[in-house]
């Protein structure tokens, strides 16, 4: 019987009493827990998310009455395994909960049907992982005062006249412009440090700032004007930065039209010189005792001697040609020498005479002279049309006589 009774008791005994033993919570502990929960709730509400509408819906869904907030806070504090809210509520806890509800930032308004329909479930704060990118922490941004825009010169003149007529401001009004001038000096130092990193200096520009501030001291408005003019070295790192309107543009040699072709020619010449230099060094490093190397040296020396002799002869001929009076109008020295020079010149340039006597290939400044020369040569070398016809007739008659003699039908 005893085993049967024990089995029945174990079957009827509630499982919650065995798994979760009861525990009592002291008022001090409950107060501390409520305080920590309130801090955590404020932290969660202060963390903004990417979706602004979600935060608004979350705030609207958290609007509860005093009694409902008290019940919700007590349910959040006590887990179902420890104790219920009715068993622990004491006068001290009620006072603490009411004060906590009054301190909360939630507006005291009841639930509505739309808020219940649109209520969204937020993620618990203890389940947020550190690497969750959807949560953006909001840092307190420093307040940056914007510099006022410079006013026209007419207003500054009127303000200077007004300052001359009005009494001097008190030290309190002078402290505010000093702080603003310090801010402008700091901004100018930042501009100088940022421009110091650039490479090319383009020029200097003057920057002037006019700061005005109105202060009411003893019921009378006083206007303080502070004008600072500084010279700042403005530099640009690349050509993408636009030039200021007042600066003069610096012409670059590379922008000229013929500079590109000249630079390419110079580069080609330098490349050829470097190739020749490398070949010379390679020849010097080879064996000097080889017979092929000695023959190559002798042939190169003879070739150089010939080229130098030809260059000297050509230079001598040019000096003679330029020294003669052939090209002067109406003045001739020795006709035999002049004829020799001209015939030799035409003979040496016989391969290019067709290019020299075509008007399209002649430069514009020499076309008049070229036309005169070509006309004279045509008169000398070519025959008139009448003479051409007579010559053709003679040739035809001679051909007919030859055919008659040969009895060719």
UniProtKB/Swiss-Prot annotation:
Keywords: Cytoplasmic vesicle, Developmental protein, Glycoprotein, Signal
Name of the molecule in the record: Sperm equatorial segment protein 1
Pfam families, A to Z: SPESP1
One term under GO cellular component: acrosomal vesicle
Function: Involved in fertilization ability of sperm.
Chain residue ranges for the region called Disordered: 141-223
Stretches that traverse the bilayer: none
């Amino acid at each position: 019987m005893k085993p049967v009774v024990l089995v029945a008791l174990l079957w009827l005994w509630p499982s919650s009493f065995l798994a979760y033993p009861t525990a009592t919570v002291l008022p001090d502990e409950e107060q501390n827990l409520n305080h920590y929960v309130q801090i955590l709730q404020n932290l969660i509400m202060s963390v903004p998310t990417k979706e602004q509408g979600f935060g608004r819906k979350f705030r609207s869904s958290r609007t509860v009455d005093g009694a409902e907030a008290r019940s919700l806070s007590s349910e959040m504090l006590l887990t179902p395994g420890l104790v219920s809210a009715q068993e622990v509520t004491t006068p001290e806890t009620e006072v603490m909960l009411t004060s906590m509800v009054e301190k909360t930032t939630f507006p005291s308004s009841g639930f509505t049907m739309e808020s219940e329909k649109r209520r969204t479930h937020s993620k618990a704060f203890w389940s947020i992982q550190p690497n969750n990118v959807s949560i953006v922490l909001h840092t307190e941004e420093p307040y940056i005062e914007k510099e006022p825009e410079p006013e026209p010169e007419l207003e500054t003149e009127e303000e200077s006249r007004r300052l001359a007529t009005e009494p001097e401001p008190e030290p309190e009004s002078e402290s505010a412009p000093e702080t603003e001038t310090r801010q402008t000096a700091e901004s100018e130092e930042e501009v100088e440090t940022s421009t110091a990193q650039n490479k090319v200096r383009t020029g200097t520009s003057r920057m002037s700032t006019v700061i005005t501030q109105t202060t009411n001291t003893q019921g009378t408005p006083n206007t303080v004007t502070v004008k600072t003019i500084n010279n700042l070295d403005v530099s640009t790192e690349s050509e993408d930065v636009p030039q200021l309107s007042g600066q003069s543009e610096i012409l670059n040699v590379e922008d000229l039209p013929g500079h590109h072709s000249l630079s390419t020619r110079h580069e080609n010449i330098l490349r050829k010189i470097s190739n020749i230099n490398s070949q010379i060094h390679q020849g010097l490093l080879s064996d000097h005792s080889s017979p092929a190397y000695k023959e190559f040296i002798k042939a190169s020396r003879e070739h150089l001697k010939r080229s130098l002799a030809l260059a000297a002869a050509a230079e001598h001929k040019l000096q003679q040609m330029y020294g003669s009076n052939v090209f002067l109008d109406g003045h001739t020295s020795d006709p035999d020498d002049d004829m020799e020079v001209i015939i030799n010149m035409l003979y040496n340039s016989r391969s290019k005479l067709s290019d020299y006597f075509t008007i399209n290939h002649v430069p514009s400044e020499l076309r008049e002279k070229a036309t005169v020369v070509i006309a004279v040569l045509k008169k000398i070398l070519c025959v008139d049309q009448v003479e051409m016809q007579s010559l053709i007739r003679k040739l035809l008659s001679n051909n007919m006589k030859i055919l008659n003699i040969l009895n060719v039908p």
